[in-house]
């Protein structure tokens, strides 16, 4: 490789080594330039560490003024330094020797080649000296060879450039990848502080090794390419040389051929030497490259560590510098504003002083003057001066107005920048939180997804970093532009002040000259008049005519002289006016140019903002796409879970089908026995009829009891508060009595059945026992079915509650989303608060004051937080009471179900223990039943656990929400406390107070209307809930639009404040605003709205207190009615349960028979665990018996029955053991026959069941007739049902009350937002009106200025006419005047045109 290419590659590598790689490409920042100058040019520069050196170099190199140094600008630095170095070396004495010594080692081969070429051409010249044709041929040959060599050289250079470019691109790509990977590694290391650090380090080491291997392979490939290229070049050179030799051999004589052969041999030797040297150089290069690679790796490692440290330090320094710069800028802007104000005040004071001096001078001039003409002159001059001061004061006013406008524009730009930065940071934090959430969601997913997410996060972070850099760059440029504008404005102001001073001096000088000139002219006129009078007195009449002619000539001359002087003065005045106008035009042109530039800058910024918005929109769309994918994945997971649920349910259904089959088999077996025992069925029907008769009697008793309870309830309504507990006790006693009667009747039935069974034979006893067991099993199945239906009802209710909870969860999620945004804002504020605290650590006094303020704020916050916590605690207590009430009801229902289940289990177990030794099949069936019940209990336990977990989860989420609300409320109170100090001063303004009063009155009226419409709102609430989501979306859009509108409104308000409020109060407010603007500029709008909301909430709470006092009685009445309705509902439920039991028994007997057959299969599975569960059940029964005091009598009766049953068992056991073998044999035969007679028995059973159903339907119709006869009772039931429905509606209302309160809060929030929007629209209208008024005012001022100019022109024209007319009148008057002193006594004072002109001017300016 040539030294030139090597030096170029070294320059490129050095640049890439120190450059920062962004989206704009590789550029040198100020810090990078500092490091480069320190390390690479430390020996050349005098002071490389000095920041001024870096600033000077940056200003010299940064041609495009973007604060960054590109590669072309870096090359400019290299060329300048090289030029300076060569110039310094050329000045030295030993430059040639150094060059020779330096070139001897490198260019030895080239010198030998040149010497050989010279020898060869000298021989050729000697041979062809006398032959001109040979010379010409030689020249042509040389030119051709040179051209071919040039082409080959160009090819080689192009080839080398191509490969060097490829190599450079690869190196840059690798460096970029390294940088990106380093950044990604840093970020990942930061994120992974505590998790999988060792695995991450190992992965990173593997990745680095892979990268190093890739680099090494790339270098090897590059080296192989270079070798191939060199071989190819050598082959090309050899081929070309062979072709050249062949041509020369053909054309040259033998002697020359010999010479050429010798030369070629010499060249071949040289080439061999060159090849050997190249190989040696290549080996050295390879060794050097390996050493350099090792060094580079070490350096890179060290540099990586250094860069990591430096980056951390840089980030901290940048933050501190940014904060300090912002503080400095703010202080500088503040100082500049104060200086501008002071200058304006000084200018105004100087103008006042000048005016006072001018007035004093004029007064002195007036006092000095004695003649009337001087007074008239002074009056004219004073009026002209007033007009001129008006004319010249206008530019000054315009200048002040332009300064204010510039200041306002600057403040607007600063606010816009701050808001944009806040919005950008907010979006950035939102994106970071979203990425964090995605990472948390996908933490359990495959590593490929993690890599994709990491890559996306890396790209997003790089993009954010680039955007921050661009925004910083733009901010620096804007600040530079603003500083330049301010400097230009200062220069223009100084220039204008100088011009005004010079103009005032010229005006004063002219005024003095004019004051002196009239006195001289009048003295000269007086002398002439005296001479003329003397001549007229003593001259002859002929001479008088001559004298008159001479006087006329003199008058004409004087008039011409005055006119000439007047024209000269007018010409000077015009020139000055034109000069002034030209300056004004130039200034206006410059201002227009500046405005155009500003507009161009604004347009460019707007375009950039639009581009940023588009990019953000694209990012948002990408984010939405990612979220959509995540939602799809979650949906897939839900579908999988649903499929699993369906699979589980399918298995359960299959198990139930198996149980049904078993029960069906059992039923078939029983049906075969039932056909043999038709008589027993008849007896059973009689027993069933008796039971129905008993049930009818019980219903009649219950109806009587209900009537009594209704009467008691009516009595209770009158004395509800005093007798609530008594009524509950009476109801409990009544229920206990009713239950006791039912149990006694059941016991009597059982005793009658047992007596009847004892009377009959043992075979009939066994059959009856089996039938009784069958009936009991049917009853158990019916009860289980009822229990299953109740469970389904509970599950349905639970699903409805879950659906409600899901809706609430969605609302909570939306609330969490809003709260998350608020938390993000609060996090922003917290970070700013931390930065502010770090700043305040340096300022001890401010910290102490702020600590005091914080303590006061904290006390206020604690007080408010305490009140809010009390309110929230009350709400929580209400919610908790509602939950407890609901849970209590569920627990009561569950307890009732458990008691029923336990009683059923006890009865079943008792009977199973009696027949334990008699029937093994019955034991197996019982075991299967217990197994199924165990599974059901386990499922119920699982359901209960799930419900408990859901409740705990809900409670935990509610606690978290409440905690978040508390934190948010505390933070909001802090913000409110901070904003309160600012708002106290703003509320002092009368206009805002009046508007707020009007707005409050209007809001108060609207809230009264809202309170009246609340009942109507309750009916529309369901429809409103459906539209709530759509409204939220629209609200989000409107919030974005409102943000822009509010930003615009805020700008207009600030402009209006700046225009209207010029007093010290506003300056103090602006100073305070500036202190708080860094932290609360974006929140000010929200806090204002929150203040209005708090004010409205306070009034609303006061109104609500009044309304609550009115509604307390209504609520108490509702509470009484609710309790009555609850009692009636319980009674109605009991009635309904009895009715449902009766109806369900008639409808579902067939289904229960099938399920009894299915249950037989389950019983076979339960046989294995019978004994263990029996022991557990016995223990539970003992505990339950100990607990249940009210069932003591029942247990005693059961013990008696058990003793009797035990005696019966002993008697039975003796005979059953004998019959057991027979039964087993029969069962085996029956099992064989069962498969054969399955369908026949099933058909017979169906027929019998149909007959039974008909009988039941007939009896059911009879009972319906009885029910129709009791229409009054039904009406009362309907009345109770209506009351219970109202009660249910009230319960629903109470359950929805919490939701309504939330919706009411949301509605209030929306109403407040609507109120804020209306207020903003009113403010906009007011501001538009003000703008319209200002525009009209400006139009009036413009018209007034035009009118003034027109009047000035007319006045000038009128003055000319007056002067001409006055001149003519003077001439005529002088001709008419007679000689004598009487001429001066009749001076025209009242009738002069000058006096008329003065009077006209006075009338114009008179108020």
Swiss-Prot record:
Family designation: Belongs to the S100-fused protein family.
Alphabetically ordered keywords of this record: Calcium, Citrullination, Keratinization, Metal-binding, Repeat
Organism: Oryctolagus cuniculus
Name of this protein: Trichohyalin
Summary of the tissues where the protein is detected: Found in the hard keratinizing tissues such as the inner root sheath (IRS) of hair follicles and medulla, and in the filiform papillae of dorsal tongue epithelium.
Listed GO MF terms: calcium ion binding; transition metal ion binding
Source organism phylogeny: Eukaryota, Metazoa, Chordata, Craniata, Vertebrata
One Pfam entry name: S_100
Compositionally biased tracts (Basic and acidic residues): 362-381, 396-424, 447-471, 554-587, 1313-1376
Assembly mode: Homodimer.
Region (S-100-like): 1-91
Keyword Calcium carried by entry: yes
Binding site for Ca(2+) 2: 62, 64, 66, 73
């Amino acid at each position: 490789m040539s030294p030139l290419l090597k030096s170029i590659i070294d320059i490129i590598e050095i640049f890439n080594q120190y450059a920062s790689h962004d989206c704009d490409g590789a550029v040198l920042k100020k810090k990078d330039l500092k490091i480069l100058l320190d390390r690479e040019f430390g020996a050349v520069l005098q002071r490389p560490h000095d920041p001024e050196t870096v600033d000077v170099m940056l200003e010299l190199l940064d041609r495009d003024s973007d604060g960054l140094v590109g590669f072309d600008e870096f090359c400019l630095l290299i060329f300048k330094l090289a030029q300076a170095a060569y110039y310094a070396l050329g000045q030295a004495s030993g430059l040639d020797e150094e060059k020779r010594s330096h070139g001897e080692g490198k260019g030895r081969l080239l010198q030998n080649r040149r010497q050989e070429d010279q020898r060869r051409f000298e021989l050729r010249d000697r041979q062809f000296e006398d032959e001109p044709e040979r010379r010409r041929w030689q020249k042509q040959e040389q030119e051709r060879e040179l051209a071919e060599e040039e082409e080959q050289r160009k090819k080689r250079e192009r080839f080398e450039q191509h490969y060097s470019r490829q190599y450079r691109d690869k190196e840059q790509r690798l460096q970029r990848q390294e940088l990106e990977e380093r950044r990604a590694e840093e970020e990942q290391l930061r994120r992974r502080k505590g998790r999988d650090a060792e695995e991450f380090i190992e992965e990173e080491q593997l990745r680095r090794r892979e990268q190093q291997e890739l680099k090494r392979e790339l270098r090897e490939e590059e080296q192989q390419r270079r070798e191939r290229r060199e071989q190819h070049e050598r082959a090309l050179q050899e081929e070309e040389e062979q072709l050249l030799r062949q041509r020369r051999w053909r054309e040259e004589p033998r002697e020359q051929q010999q010479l050429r052969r010798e030369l070629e041999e010499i060249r071949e030797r040289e080439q061999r030497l060159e090849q050997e040297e190249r190989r040696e150089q290549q080996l050295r290069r390879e060794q050097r490259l390996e050493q350099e690679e090792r060094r580079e790796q070490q350096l890179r490692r060290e540099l990586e560590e250094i860069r990591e440290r430096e980056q951390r330090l840089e980030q901290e320094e940048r933050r501190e510098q940014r904060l300090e710069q912002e503080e400095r800028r703010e202080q500088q802007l503040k100082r500049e504003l104060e200086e501008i104000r002071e200058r304006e005040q000084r200018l105004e004071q100087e103008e006042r002083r000048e005016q006072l001096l001018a007035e004093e001078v004029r007064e002195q001039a007036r006092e000095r003057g004695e003649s009337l003409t001087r007074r008239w002159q002074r009056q004219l001059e004073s009026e002209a001066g007033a007009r001129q001061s008006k004319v010249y004061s206008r530019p000054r006013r315009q200048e002040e107005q332009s300064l204010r406008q510039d200041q306002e524009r600057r403040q607007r730009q600063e606010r816009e920048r701050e808001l944009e930065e806040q919005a950008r940071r907010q979006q950035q934090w939102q994106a970071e939180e979203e990425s964090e959430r995605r990472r948390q969601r996908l933490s359990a997913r495959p590593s490929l997804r993690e890599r994709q997410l990491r890559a996306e996060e890396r790209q997003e972070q790089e993009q954010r970093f680039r955007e921050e850099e661009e925004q910083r760059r733009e901010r620096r440029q804007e600040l530079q532009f603003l500083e330049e504008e301010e400097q230009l404005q200062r220069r223009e102001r100084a220039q204008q002040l100088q011009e005004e001073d010079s103009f005032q001096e010229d005006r004063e000088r002219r005024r003095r000259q004019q004051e002196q000139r009239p006195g001289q002219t009048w003295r000269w006129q007086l002398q002439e008049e005296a001479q003329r009078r003397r001549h007229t007195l003593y001259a002859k009449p002929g001479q008088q005519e001559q004298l008159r002619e001479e006087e006329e000539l003199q008058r004409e001359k004087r008039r011409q002289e005055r006119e000439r002087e007047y024209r000269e003065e007018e010409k000077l005045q015009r020139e000055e006016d034109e000069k002034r106008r030209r300056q004004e035009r130039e200034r206006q042109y410059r201002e227009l140019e500046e405005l155009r530039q500003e507009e161009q800058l604004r347009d460019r910024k707007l375009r950039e903002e639009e581009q940023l918005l588009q990019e953000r929109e694209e990012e948002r769309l990408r984010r939405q796409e990612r979220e959509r994918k995540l939602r799809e994945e979650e949906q897939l997971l839900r579908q999988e879970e649903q499929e699993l649920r369906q699979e589980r349910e399918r298995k359960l259904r299959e198990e139930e089908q198996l149980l049904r089959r078993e029960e069906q088999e059992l039923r078939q077996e029983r049906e075969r026995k039932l056909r043999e025992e038709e008589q027993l069925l008849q007896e059973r029907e009689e027993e069933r009829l008796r039971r129905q008769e008993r049930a009818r009697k019980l219903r009649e008793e219950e109806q009587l009891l209900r009537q009594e309870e209704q009467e008691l309830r009516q009595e209770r309504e009158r004395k509800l508060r005093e007798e609530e507990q008594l009524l509950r006790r009476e109801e409990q006693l009544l229920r206990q009595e009713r239950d006791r009667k039912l149990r006694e009747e059941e016991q009597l039935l059982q005793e009658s059945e047992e007596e009847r069974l004892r009377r009959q034979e043992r075979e009939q006893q066994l059959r009856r026992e089996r039938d009784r067991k069958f009936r009991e099993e049917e009853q158990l199945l019916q009860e289980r079915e009822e229990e299953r239906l109740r469970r389904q009802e509970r599950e349905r209710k639970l699903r409805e509650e879950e659906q409600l909870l899901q809706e609430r969860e969605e609302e909570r999620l939306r609330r969490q989303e809003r709260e998350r945004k608020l938390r993000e804002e609060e996090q922003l504020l917290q970070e700013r608060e931390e930065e502010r605290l770090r700043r305040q650590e340096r300022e001890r006094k401010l910290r102490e004051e702020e600590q005091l303020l914080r303590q006061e704020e904290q006390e206020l916050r604690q007080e408010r937080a305490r009140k809010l916590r009390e309110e929230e605690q009350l709400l929580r207590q209400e919610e908790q009471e509602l939950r407890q009430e609901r849970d209590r009801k569920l627990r009561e229902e569950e307890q009732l179900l458990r008691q029923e289940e336990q009683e059923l289990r006890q009865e079943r177990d008792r009977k199973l223990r009696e027949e334990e030794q008699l029937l093994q099949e019955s034991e197996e069936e019982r075991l299967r039943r217990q197994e199924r019940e165990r599974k059901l209990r386990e499922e119920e336990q699982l359901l209960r656990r799930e419900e408990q977990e859901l409740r705990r989860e809900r409670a935990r989420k509610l606690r978290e929400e409440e905690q978040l609300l508390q934190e948010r409320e505390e933070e909001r109170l802090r913000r409110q406390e901070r904003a309160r100090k600012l708002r106290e001063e703003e509320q002092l303004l009368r206009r805002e107070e009046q508007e707020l009063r009007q707005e409050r009155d209007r809001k108060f009226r609207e809230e009264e209307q809202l309170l009246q419409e609340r009942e109507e709102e309750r009916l529309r609430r369901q429809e409103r809930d459906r539209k709530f989501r759509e409204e939220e979306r629209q609200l989000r859009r409107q919030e974005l639009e409102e943000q822009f509108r509010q930003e615009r409104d805020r700008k207009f308000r600030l402009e209006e404040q700046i225009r209207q409020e010029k007093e010290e109060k506003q300056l103090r407010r602006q100073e305070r605003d500036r202190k708080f603007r860094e932290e609360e500029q974006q929140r000010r709008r929200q806090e204002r709205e929150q203040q209005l909301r708090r004010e409205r909430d306070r009034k609303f709470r006061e109104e609500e207190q009044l309304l609550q006092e009115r509604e307390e009685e209504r609520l108490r009445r509702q509470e009484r009615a609710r309790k009555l309705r609850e009692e009636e509902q319980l009674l109605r439920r009991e009635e309904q349960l009895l009715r449902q039991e009766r109806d369900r028994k008639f409808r579902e007997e067939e289904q229960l028979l099938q399920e009894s057959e299915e249950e037989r299969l389950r019983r076979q599975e339960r046989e294995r665990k019978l004994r263990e569960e029996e022991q557990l059940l016995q223990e539970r029964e003992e505990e339950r018996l100990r607990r249940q005091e009210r069932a003591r009598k029942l247990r005693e009766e059961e013990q008696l029955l058990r003793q009797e049953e035990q005696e019966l068992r002993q008697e039975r056991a003796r005979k059953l053991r004998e019959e057991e073998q027979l039964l087993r044999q029969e069962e085996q035969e029956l099992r064989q026959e069962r498969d054969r007679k399955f369908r026949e028995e099933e058909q017979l059973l169906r027929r019998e069941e149909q007959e039974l159903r008909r009988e039941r339907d007939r009896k059911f119709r009879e009972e319906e007739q009885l029910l129709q006869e009791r229409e009054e009772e039904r009406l009362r039931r309907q009345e109770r049902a209506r009351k219970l429905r109202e009660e249910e509606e009230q319960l629903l209302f109470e359950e929805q009350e919490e939701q309504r309160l939330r919706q009411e809060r949301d509605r209030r929030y929306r109403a407040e937002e609507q109120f804020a929007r209306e207020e903003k629209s009113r403010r906009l209208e007011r501001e538009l009106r003000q703008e319209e008024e200002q525009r009209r005012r400006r139009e009036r001022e413009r018209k007034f200025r035009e009118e003034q100019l027109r009047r000035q022109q007319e006045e000038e024209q009128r003055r000319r006419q007056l002067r001409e007319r006055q001149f003519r009148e003077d001439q005529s008057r002088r001709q008419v005047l007679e000689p004598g002193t009487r001429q001066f006594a009749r001076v025209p004072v009242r009738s002069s045109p000058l006096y008329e002109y003065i009077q006209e001017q006075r009338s114009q300016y008179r108020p």
